[in-house]
Amino acid sequence: ADPPVVGXYEYATCR
């Protein structure tokens, strides 16, 4: 479980 990364929106699923 990873925290929400800045730039995306949910659990580092942005990149």
UniProtKB/Swiss-Prot annotation:
It comes from the Eukaryota. This is Unknown protein. It comes from Metarhizium anisopliae.
